[in-house]
């Protein structure tokens, strides 16, 4: 088996991140609570209660309940739990989480006030890392060879271009028979993965809201998202050959995704009973339309040894010698650079909340997001964009609708002091038996990236907060614990016919935030 086969597959991997469900799910799935410390302390369940800058995202109508000018600033820190079977604790301190302002203008007649607002806040934190080992007979290199054979069977020659057969980088073997599974690996030899990701998803939001008769509130928010994800994966496996020599195979993948998105949110809140503070809220959030840019750099390092059917060695390194090949460096704008677009699903939220006297408030919220409705598009050479139907099929197969339940409360033992608590339950967007097969259809053959994927559990978020008010000034603190598990697969073992062996990953995260604000 030629070593070049691995290089050709690695070259293919560079051509599109848009086919990578691991990163795409990271972008479109923002199942967390960020914002002011009051909002976080109540678990984000303030869509019907309103009167906080962070409801600009959950229910735009809630800002209509603010009758004075307001400004707030939030900063914080977060740290990871025991982040895998072997654990890699890490923290991010000095985070800037939120800043916003409301300008309130008095109305006349039934229009009590009209407000213009701006708010910046974090939507997702991508700072994460984990390391793990599995002991299995499955081989990443073996899987890659199986994919190479699949590519040849379906494509004939790479991209259907005969000249690629003579290109050193794309030198696929002449017949698919040369891609038979050949890697025999002892389960006692480890497979190791180190994954490190950095970055965040941030939102800049502009809001118009109105208060009608102190019973009806309406609002609209225009949101602009900024995406910055940097992820590095280092995979290493080894086997002991029949002569007792250790043969290594290493794969390093560096990925960068940047870009912007746009969305709209429409909200309404009503007090159905004039004499009661009880409120009902409803929000519709359009998809976020992302324009993204992707850069990928991959390398393969191996001492594996293969023969062809005739027994002739295609590649035979000297003892102790490694062969490393970087497919293309980052300066190449054709192979390692891609522009694409993602459309996230529609979201709807139903909310309720109320106050009891002047010292207690509660809120409940339900959100539905149809993640199978997400889609990917590419710029077309004829102008406009083209929907990737193959990836849409993958999305329908892998993802399922997400349901989110939020609950929160605030208690004031005295008028100046508040104690808050909240809870979120968020269902997973993937099924436990989901897997990633980058060669499931002809179109997708030209767009694989890495072979790794992660199946996620449901998410639980518990929050606690404290607040202090004095005249025009307020200060709030919040603590958040986000609990989620994952099963990470460096590859699917379909072509190896070996039982899967995932790395258990603990995605738990702790965070604290502090907010300072003024109303005048």
Predicted regions located by residue number:
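Positively charged n-region of N-terminal signal peptides that target proteins for export
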Residues: 1-4
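Glycine/Thr-rich phosphate-binding loops that ligate phosphate moieties of nucleotide
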Residues: 7
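Outer-membrane beta-barrel translocator/receptor signature
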Residues: 37, 49-58, 63-137, 199-202
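Outer-membrane beta-barrel porins/channels
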Residues: 19-34, 40, 102-520
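Hydrophobic h-region of N-terminal signal peptides that target proteins for export
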Residues: 10-17
């Amino acid at each position: 088996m030629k070593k070049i086969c691995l290089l050709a597959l690695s070259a293919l991997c560079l051509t599109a991140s848009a086919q990578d469900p691991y990163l795409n799910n990271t972008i479109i799935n923002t199942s967390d609570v960020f914002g002011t410390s009051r909002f976080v302390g109540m678990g984000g369940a303030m869509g019907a209660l309103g009167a906080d800058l962070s409801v600009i995202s959950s229910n735009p109508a809630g800002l209509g309940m603010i009758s004075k000018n307001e400004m707030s600033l939030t900063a914080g820190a977060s740290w990871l739990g025991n982040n895998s079977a072997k654990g890699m604790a890490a923290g991010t301190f000095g985070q800037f989480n939120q800043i916003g302002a409301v300008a309130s203008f008095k109305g006349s007649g039934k229009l009590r006030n009209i407000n213009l607002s701006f708010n910046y806040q974090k939507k997702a934190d991508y700072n994460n890392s984990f390391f793990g080992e599995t002991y299995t007979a499955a081989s990443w290199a073996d899987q890659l060879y199986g994919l190479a054979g699949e590519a040849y069977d379906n494509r004939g020659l790479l991209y259907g271009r005969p000249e690629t057969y003579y290109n050193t980088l794309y030198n696929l073997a002449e017949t698919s028979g040369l891609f038979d599974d050949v890697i025999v690996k002892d389960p006692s030899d480890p497979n190791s993965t180190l994954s490190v990701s950095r970055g965040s998803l941030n939102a800049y939001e502009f809001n118009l809201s109105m208060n009608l008769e102190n019973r009806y509130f309406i609002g609209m928010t225009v949101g602009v998202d900024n995406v910055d994800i940097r992820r590095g994966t280092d995979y290493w496996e080894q086997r002991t050959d029949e002569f007792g020599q250790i043969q290594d195979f290493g794969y390093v993948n560096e990925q960068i995704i940047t870009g912007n998105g746009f969305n709209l949110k429409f909200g309404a809140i009503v007090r159905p009973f004039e004499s009661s503070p009880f409120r009902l809220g409803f929000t519709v959030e359009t998809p976020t339309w992302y324009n993204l840019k992707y850069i990928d750099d991959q390398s393969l390092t191996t001492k594996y040894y293969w023969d062809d059917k005739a027994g002739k060695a295609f590649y035979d390194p000297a003892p102790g010698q490694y062969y490393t090949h970087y497919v293309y460096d980052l300066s190449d704008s054709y192979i390692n650079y891609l522009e694409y677009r993602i459309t996230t699903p529609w979201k709807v939220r139903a909310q309720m909340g109320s106050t009891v006297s002047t010292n207690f408030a509660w809120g409940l919220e339900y959100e539905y997001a149809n993640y199978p409705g997400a889609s990917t598009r590419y710029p077309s050479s004829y102008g406009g964009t083209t929907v990737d139907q193959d990836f849409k099929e993958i999305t329908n197969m892998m993802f399922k609708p997400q349901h989110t339940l939020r609950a929160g409360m605030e208690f004031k033992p005295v008028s100046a002091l508040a104690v808050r608590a909240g809870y979120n339950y968020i269902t997973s967007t993937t099924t436990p038996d989901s897997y990633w097969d980058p060669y499931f259809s002809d179109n997708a053959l030209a767009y694989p990236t890495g072979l790794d994927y992660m199946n996620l559990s449901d998410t639980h978020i518990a929050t606690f907060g404290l607040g202090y008010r004095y005249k025009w000034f307020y200060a709030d603190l919040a603590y958040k614990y986000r609990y989620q598990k994952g099963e990470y697969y460096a590859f699917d073992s379909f072509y190896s016919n070996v039982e899967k062996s995932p790395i258990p990953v603990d995605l738990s995260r702790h965070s604290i935030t502090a907010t300072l604000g003024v109303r005048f």
